[in-house]
A protein has these predicted regions:
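Cysteine endopeptidase catalytic domains of the caspase/legumain-like
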Residues: 1-276
Protein backbone atom coordinates (compact mmCIF):
# COMPACT_ATOMS: atom_id res chain seq x y z
CA UNK A 1 0.00 0.00 0.00
CA UNK A 2 2.72 2.43 0.93
CA UNK A 3 6.41 2.25 1.71
CA UNK A 4 8.02 2.33 5.13
CA UNK A 5 11.22 4.34 5.06
CA UNK A 6 13.89 3.26 7.54
CA UNK A 7 17.21 4.98 8.09
CA UNK A 8 19.94 2.96 9.78
CA UNK A 9 21.79 6.19 10.64
CA UNK A 10 19.21 7.22 13.24
CA UNK A 11 20.87 7.89 16.60
CA UNK A 12 17.61 8.14 18.56
CA UNK A 13 16.36 5.56 21.04
CA UNK A 14 12.64 5.35 20.40
CA UNK A 15 11.85 2.50 22.77
CA UNK A 16 10.34 4.86 25.37
CA UNK A 17 8.13 6.72 22.91
CA UNK A 18 6.07 6.03 19.83
CA UNK A 19 7.05 8.36 17.01
CA UNK A 20 5.38 7.99 13.61
CA UNK A 21 5.42 10.13 10.48
CA UNK A 22 3.17 9.83 7.44
CA UNK A 23 4.55 11.71 4.45
CA UNK A 24 2.16 12.15 1.54
CA UNK A 25 3.26 13.40 -1.88
CA UNK A 26 1.04 13.52 -4.97
CA UNK A 27 2.42 14.56 -8.35
CA UNK A 28 -0.01 12.61 -10.51
CA UNK A 29 -3.56 13.94 -10.89
CA UNK A 30 -4.96 11.94 -13.84
CA UNK A 31 -7.17 13.74 -16.31
CA UNK A 32 -6.64 17.21 -14.84
CA UNK A 33 -3.68 18.64 -16.81
CA UNK A 34 -2.48 19.86 -13.42
CA UNK A 35 0.22 17.35 -12.51
CA UNK A 36 2.97 18.53 -10.18
CA UNK A 37 6.65 17.59 -10.01
CA UNK A 38 8.01 18.19 -6.52
CA UNK A 39 5.49 16.63 -4.15
CA UNK A 40 6.88 13.10 -4.08
CA UNK A 41 10.34 14.58 -3.52
CA UNK A 42 8.91 16.49 -0.56
CA UNK A 43 7.47 13.30 0.92
CA UNK A 44 10.76 11.44 0.53
CA UNK A 45 12.74 14.30 2.06
CA UNK A 46 10.36 14.75 4.99
CA UNK A 47 10.47 11.00 5.64
CA UNK A 48 14.27 11.04 5.64
CA UNK A 49 14.39 14.00 8.00
CA UNK A 50 11.88 12.61 10.48
CA UNK A 51 13.45 9.16 10.46
CA UNK A 52 16.84 10.59 11.39
CA UNK A 53 15.09 11.95 14.48
CA UNK A 54 13.70 8.61 15.56
CA UNK A 55 10.41 8.39 13.69
CA UNK A 56 9.12 5.44 11.73
CA UNK A 57 8.26 7.15 8.44
CA UNK A 58 5.72 5.97 5.89
CA UNK A 59 5.86 7.44 2.38
CA UNK A 60 2.51 7.54 0.57
CA UNK A 61 2.63 8.73 -3.02
CA UNK A 62 0.41 9.23 -6.05
CA UNK A 63 -2.17 6.45 -6.60
CA UNK A 64 -1.72 5.11 -3.06
CA UNK A 65 -2.73 8.47 -1.57
CA UNK A 66 -6.48 7.90 -1.66
CA UNK A 67 -9.20 9.62 0.34
CA UNK A 68 -9.90 6.47 2.34
CA UNK A 69 -6.24 5.98 3.19
CA UNK A 70 -5.87 9.64 4.17
CA UNK A 71 -8.79 9.40 6.58
CA UNK A 72 -7.49 6.11 7.95
CA UNK A 73 -4.13 7.74 8.64
CA UNK A 74 -5.84 10.53 10.59
CA UNK A 75 -7.82 7.96 12.57
CA UNK A 76 -4.67 5.93 13.25
CA UNK A 77 -2.94 9.05 14.59
CA UNK A 78 -5.90 9.65 16.90
CA UNK A 79 -5.92 6.02 18.06
CA UNK A 80 -2.19 6.08 18.79
CA UNK A 81 -2.52 9.36 20.68
CA UNK A 82 -5.12 7.83 22.97
CA UNK A 83 -3.16 4.61 23.36
CA UNK A 84 0.21 6.18 24.17
CA UNK A 85 -0.82 9.58 25.56
CA UNK A 86 2.09 11.90 26.30
CA UNK A 87 4.51 9.34 24.86
CA UNK A 88 3.07 9.71 21.36
CA UNK A 89 4.45 12.11 18.76
CA UNK A 90 3.00 12.11 15.26
CA UNK A 91 3.85 13.99 12.10
CA UNK A 92 1.73 14.24 8.96
CA UNK A 93 3.07 16.01 5.88
CA UNK A 94 1.02 16.65 2.76
CA UNK A 95 2.45 17.95 -0.51
CA UNK A 96 0.02 18.18 -3.38
CA UNK A 97 -2.83 20.27 -4.68
CA UNK A 98 -5.24 22.11 -2.42
CA UNK A 99 -8.62 23.48 -3.41
CA UNK A 100 -11.81 24.99 -2.04
CA UNK A 101 -15.47 23.99 -2.03
CA UNK A 102 -18.57 25.87 -0.89
CA UNK A 103 -18.85 26.11 2.90
CA UNK A 104 -22.15 24.55 3.93
CA UNK A 105 -21.86 24.72 7.72
CA UNK A 106 -21.11 28.43 8.04
CA UNK A 107 -17.76 28.02 9.82
CA UNK A 108 -15.68 29.83 7.19
CA UNK A 109 -15.75 33.63 6.94
CA UNK A 110 -14.91 33.52 3.23
CA UNK A 111 -17.72 31.09 2.46
CA UNK A 112 -15.33 28.34 1.34
CA UNK A 113 -14.09 25.15 2.94
CA UNK A 114 -10.48 24.24 2.25
CA UNK A 115 -9.63 20.76 1.05
CA UNK A 116 -6.68 18.50 0.33
CA UNK A 117 -6.71 16.97 -3.16
CA UNK A 118 -5.98 13.29 -2.79
CA UNK A 119 -5.41 11.03 -5.79
CA UNK A 120 -9.09 10.10 -6.08
CA UNK A 121 -10.96 12.93 -4.37
CA UNK A 122 -10.98 15.50 -1.58
CA UNK A 123 -10.63 15.54 2.18
CA UNK A 124 -12.44 18.64 3.46
CA UNK A 125 -10.98 20.60 6.38
CA UNK A 126 -14.21 20.02 8.33
CA UNK A 127 -13.63 16.27 8.06
CA UNK A 128 -10.05 16.64 9.26
CA UNK A 129 -11.14 18.71 12.26
CA UNK A 130 -13.88 16.23 13.15
CA UNK A 131 -11.43 13.32 13.21
CA UNK A 132 -8.74 15.23 15.10
CA UNK A 133 -11.21 16.45 17.72
CA UNK A 134 -10.62 13.12 19.49
CA UNK A 135 -6.82 13.48 19.48
CA UNK A 136 -5.33 13.20 22.98
CA UNK A 137 -4.27 16.67 24.12
CA UNK A 138 -1.34 15.16 26.04
CA UNK A 139 0.10 13.71 22.81
CA UNK A 140 1.63 15.76 20.01
CA UNK A 141 0.83 16.08 16.32
CA UNK A 142 2.55 18.28 13.76
CA UNK A 143 0.91 18.73 10.37
CA UNK A 144 2.73 20.27 7.40
CA UNK A 145 0.43 21.23 4.52
CA UNK A 146 2.45 22.45 1.55
CA UNK A 147 -0.45 23.21 -0.75
CA UNK A 148 -2.73 26.15 -1.40
CA UNK A 149 -6.44 26.83 -1.26
CA UNK A 150 -6.76 30.12 -3.13
CA UNK A 151 -10.12 30.71 -4.77
CA UNK A 152 -9.01 33.69 -6.86
CA UNK A 153 -7.90 31.72 -9.89
CA UNK A 154 -9.93 30.51 -12.87
CA UNK A 155 -9.61 27.20 -14.68
CA UNK A 156 -8.44 28.72 -17.94
CA UNK A 157 -5.85 30.91 -16.27
CA UNK A 158 -4.48 28.04 -14.24
CA UNK A 159 -3.72 26.08 -17.38
CA UNK A 160 -1.36 28.84 -18.55
CA UNK A 161 0.09 29.78 -15.17
CA UNK A 162 3.29 27.79 -15.48
CA UNK A 163 6.59 29.61 -15.73
CA UNK A 164 8.91 27.45 -17.82
CA UNK A 165 11.87 29.69 -17.07
CA UNK A 166 11.37 29.52 -13.31
CA UNK A 167 9.97 25.99 -13.51
CA UNK A 168 7.36 26.92 -10.91
CA UNK A 169 3.68 26.08 -10.62
CA UNK A 170 1.03 26.79 -7.96
CA UNK A 171 -0.24 23.83 -5.94
CA UNK A 172 -3.90 24.68 -6.49
CA UNK A 173 -6.58 22.55 -8.14
CA UNK A 174 -9.92 24.15 -9.10
CA UNK A 175 -12.85 21.99 -7.96
CA UNK A 176 -14.69 20.23 -10.77
CA UNK A 177 -18.28 21.14 -11.63
CA UNK A 178 -19.40 17.63 -10.64
CA UNK A 179 -17.73 17.97 -7.27
CA UNK A 180 -19.33 21.36 -6.66
CA UNK A 181 -22.74 19.89 -7.45
CA UNK A 182 -22.09 17.06 -5.02
CA UNK A 183 -21.00 19.47 -2.31
CA UNK A 184 -24.19 21.48 -2.75
CA UNK A 185 -26.28 18.48 -1.70
CA UNK A 186 -23.91 17.38 1.07
CA UNK A 187 -25.60 17.28 4.45
CA UNK A 188 -24.48 20.04 6.81
CA UNK A 189 -22.16 18.81 9.55
CA UNK A 190 -22.35 21.86 11.83
CA UNK A 191 -18.70 21.61 12.81
CA UNK A 192 -17.46 24.73 14.57
CA UNK A 193 -14.11 26.02 13.35
CA UNK A 194 -11.80 25.88 16.39
CA UNK A 195 -9.76 28.75 17.73
CA UNK A 196 -6.00 28.22 17.80
CA UNK A 197 -6.05 27.57 21.55
CA UNK A 198 -8.49 24.71 20.96
CA UNK A 199 -6.39 23.01 18.28
CA UNK A 200 -4.98 19.60 19.11
CA UNK A 201 -2.39 19.85 16.35
CA UNK A 202 0.41 22.22 15.36
CA UNK A 203 -0.14 23.25 11.75
CA UNK A 204 2.44 24.70 9.36
CA UNK A 205 0.98 25.76 6.02
CA UNK A 206 2.66 26.89 2.84
CA UNK A 207 0.68 30.09 2.40
CA UNK A 208 -2.30 32.21 3.31
CA UNK A 209 -5.58 30.87 1.93
CA UNK A 210 -5.57 33.76 -0.54
CA UNK A 211 -2.14 32.82 -1.95
CA UNK A 212 -0.46 30.05 -3.89
CA UNK A 213 2.06 27.56 -2.50
CA UNK A 214 4.66 27.00 -5.17
CA UNK A 215 5.97 23.79 -6.68
CA UNK A 216 9.42 24.83 -7.92
CA UNK A 217 12.81 23.74 -9.23
CA UNK A 218 15.26 24.52 -6.41
CA UNK A 219 18.80 23.23 -5.87
CA UNK A 220 18.64 20.82 -8.76
CA UNK A 221 15.24 19.22 -8.21
CA UNK A 222 11.53 19.97 -7.98
CA UNK A 223 10.16 20.53 -4.48
CA UNK A 224 7.84 22.79 -2.53
CA UNK A 225 9.27 26.23 -1.83
CA UNK A 226 8.10 26.22 1.79
CA UNK A 227 9.14 22.61 2.38
CA UNK A 228 12.59 23.32 0.94
CA UNK A 229 13.27 26.16 3.37
CA UNK A 230 11.69 24.40 6.37
CA UNK A 231 13.70 21.20 5.89
CA UNK A 232 16.94 23.10 5.35
CA UNK A 233 16.41 25.20 8.48
CA UNK A 234 15.63 22.14 10.62
CA UNK A 235 18.72 20.32 9.36
CA UNK A 236 20.90 23.30 10.25
CA UNK A 237 19.17 23.83 13.62
CA UNK A 238 18.19 20.40 15.00
CA UNK A 239 16.93 21.80 18.33
CA UNK A 240 14.74 24.49 16.80
CA UNK A 241 11.23 25.17 18.11
CA UNK A 242 8.09 25.45 15.99
CA UNK A 243 7.77 29.21 16.41
CA UNK A 244 11.42 29.83 15.59
CA UNK A 245 11.17 27.59 12.53
CA UNK A 246 8.24 29.67 11.33
CA UNK A 247 10.15 32.89 11.97
CA UNK A 248 13.15 31.59 10.04
CA UNK A 249 11.03 30.41 7.11
CA UNK A 250 9.42 33.84 6.97
CA UNK A 251 12.86 35.35 6.35
CA UNK A 252 12.78 33.65 2.95
CA UNK A 253 9.06 33.67 2.17
CA UNK A 254 7.27 35.55 0.80
CA UNK A 255 9.79 36.52 -1.86
CA UNK A 256 9.55 38.12 -5.27
CA UNK A 257 9.92 34.72 -6.90
CA UNK A 258 7.59 32.89 -4.49
CA UNK A 259 4.96 35.30 -3.07
CA UNK A 260 3.59 32.97 -0.41
CA UNK A 261 3.30 33.58 3.34
CA UNK A 262 3.70 30.41 5.47
CA UNK A 263 1.45 30.25 8.54
CA UNK A 264 1.84 28.55 11.93
CA UNK A 265 -1.28 27.67 13.92
CA UNK A 266 -1.81 25.97 17.25
CA UNK A 267 -1.77 26.54 20.98
CA UNK A 268 0.89 28.99 22.12
CA UNK A 269 2.40 26.51 24.59
CA UNK A 270 2.88 24.05 21.74
CA UNK A 271 4.51 26.54 19.38
CA UNK A 272 7.49 26.96 21.73
CA UNK A 273 8.20 23.22 21.88
CA UNK A 274 11.22 21.76 20.11
CA UNK A 275 10.26 20.00 16.89
CA UNK A 276 12.58 17.07 17.57
Amino acid sequence: MFGIFRNKNSNYNVSAKKRVAYCIGINDYPGTRNDLRGCVNDAIDWASLTQVHGYTADIIKDRDATVSLGKNILKELVNDSNKYGKDFQGILTFSGHGTHVPDLDGDEENGRDEALCMYDGLIIDDEIREILSSFNKNARLWIVADCCHSGTITRNFLETLYDEELKAKPRYMPPSDDLLALMNIRQKSYIVRPQEEDMNEILLTGSLDSEYSWDAFIDGKFQGAMSYHAKKIIRNNPGITFDKLHAEVRKFLPSRQFPQTPQLEGREQNKVLKIF
